[in-house]
């Protein structure tokens, strides 16, 4: 439910070499004498790669492999890296304390990167994802009640029923099951039922294809100085995909309006439509449409991407899969997950948390523009500095996560060493923290538990580990297929 800054192919191998030396050491880390470092004078910039005349070669490098390129610059120059890309001064920040300082303590000095907002607004309109200032606060206040922990607990029976219906369509055996597509359909159906009280049904495959097309178009547009009109011949696919998604949302909206208000279900769509009827100037139907689009796209994509990588981790690590399944069988005792039992699935939750460390759905947060001068650590940055926040580099940093390439769910156990604040941010932090994080964690835990009740996951013979690709969210470069088989009789009894 967060979104990335830019896109490109991800070199996980490059990121895994990240036993980083920091030449721009965080001033919040006290030295031996406990003395704070001196501030650099205004106008001084942190170290960074040579930019050449325009710095556009840096942009080209990022367009080829964004995360791998940023990881290399971090190794060479430290946790605060200056990129001079005319006309921009961009600063890449990968120190947890400084990232948290920006997103929490200095959030009011930052606005979201204009180019990213222009690209996303083509799909999301002027929703809470796009808005700033008072408009953002009003929209978030309107949306938040549906995503608080207590309302989310009430969704658990619906989530479990939806997951059960979806999993009933899976075959008992398949040596090459398209698990990524199946999990995406499941996530779409859950968000449709919880937010709009309807099923995705036959629209799932068409909607999935449309989302992929829109994501690919966004990838290209992040690196272009301006957007060509959608009626240009090479953008017809994007226009058709937008029409599919807009039609999906508009059908929900108008079907609800055709029903008397006293018959409306208690869901997000009804809440937004009541705001429209109470104040149509502030909440025109287009505003309702925009919020519904963001709820659908952000609401399913983070879950689908994370469950896809979780399924890979389970298949690639049979011992962890067996431990998680044993816990599911012990805790649920033949029942479907409930709000009460979900909290007891601690090891299963750790497998999801470790998956989000290794493969955060949004590995780079939307960049922030300083609206005024910002003092950050030892540096004093002028207004209009652009801050890039690649959280995946922190998630793969051996200083915070020893052996970062290893899948180790015990990192998140109760007895594990504390993770530095700001080092683990799968949902972001600060006032802009992901609105749907409670719903996402609940949905993923319920779905994962029910998968393990029914299916054993394994890697097909000869299959290489999937390569990650950043298309707004982090997905396998090629659609993930895994082998599935029925679980043991004890686990099957739990699923019945």
Give, region by region, the residue ranges found by the protein language model.
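N-terminal membrane-proximal hinge/A-helix region immediately C-terminal to the signal-anchor transmembrane segment
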Residues: 16-138, 153, 157-165, 201-202, ...
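Intrinsically disordered, low-complexity segments enriched in small polar residues
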Residues: 2, 8-11
């Amino acid at each position: 439910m967060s979104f990335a800054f830019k896109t490109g192919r991800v070199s996980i191998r490059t990121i895994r070499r990240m036993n980083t030396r920091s030449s721009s050491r965080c001033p919040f880390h006290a030295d031996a004498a406990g003395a704070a470092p001196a501030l650099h004078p205004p106008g001084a910039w942190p170290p960074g790669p040579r930019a050449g005349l325009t710095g556009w070669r840096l942009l080209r490098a990022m367009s080829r492999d964004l995360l791998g390129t940023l990881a290399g610059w971090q190794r060479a120059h430290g946790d605060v890296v200056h990129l001079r890309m005319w006309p921009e001064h961009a600063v890449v920040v990968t120190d947890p304390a400084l990232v948290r300082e920006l997103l929490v303590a200095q959030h009011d000095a930052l606005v979201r990167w204009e180019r990213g907002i222009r690209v996303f607004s083509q799909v999301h309109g002027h929703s809470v994802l796009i808005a700033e200032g008072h408009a953002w606060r009003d929209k978030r206040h309107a949306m938040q009640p549906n995503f608080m922990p207590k309302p989310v607990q009430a969704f658990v029976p619906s989530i479990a029923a939806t997951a059960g219906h979806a999993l009933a369509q899976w075959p008992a055996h398949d040596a090459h099951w398209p698990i990524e597509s199946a999990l995406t359909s499941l996530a779409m159906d859950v968000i449709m039922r919880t937010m709009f009280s309807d099923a995705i049904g036959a629209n799932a495959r068409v909607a999935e294809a449309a989302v992929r097309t829109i994501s690919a178009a966004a990838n290209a547009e992040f690196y272009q100085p301006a957007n060509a009109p959608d009626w240009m011949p090479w953008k017809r696919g994007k226009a058709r995909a937008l029409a599919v998604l807009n039609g999906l949302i508009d059908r929900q909206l108008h079907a609800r309006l055709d029903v008397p208000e006293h018959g409306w279900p208690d869901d997000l769509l009804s809440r937004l439509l009541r705001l429209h009827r109470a104040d149509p100037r502030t909440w025109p139907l287009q505003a309702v449409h925009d919020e519904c689009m963001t709820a659908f796209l952000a609401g399913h994509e983070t879950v689908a991407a994370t469950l896809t990588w979780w399924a890979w981790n389970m298949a690639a690590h049979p011992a962890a899969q067996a431990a998680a399944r044993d816990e599911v069988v012990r805790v649920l005792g033949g029942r479907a997950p409930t709000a009460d039992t979900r909290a007891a699935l601690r090891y299963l939750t750790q497998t999801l948390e470790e998956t989000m460390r290794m493969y955060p759905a949004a590995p780079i947060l939307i960049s922030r523009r300083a609206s005024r001068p910002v003092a950050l650590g030892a540096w004093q940055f002028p207004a209009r500095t652009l801050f890039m926040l690649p959280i995946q580099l922190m998630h793969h940093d051996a200083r915070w996560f020893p052996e970062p390439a290893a899948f180790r769910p015990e990192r998140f156990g109760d007895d594990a060493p504390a993770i530095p604040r700001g080092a683990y941010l799968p949902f972001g932090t600060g006032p802009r923290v992901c609105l749907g994080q409670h719903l996402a964690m609940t949905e993923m835990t319920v779905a994962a538990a029910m998968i393990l009740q029914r299916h054993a996951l394994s890697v097909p013979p000869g299959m290489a580990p999937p390569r990650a690709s950043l298309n707004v969210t982090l997905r396998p470069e090629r659609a993930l297929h895994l082998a599935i088989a029925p679980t043991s009789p004890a686990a099957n009894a739990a699923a019945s």
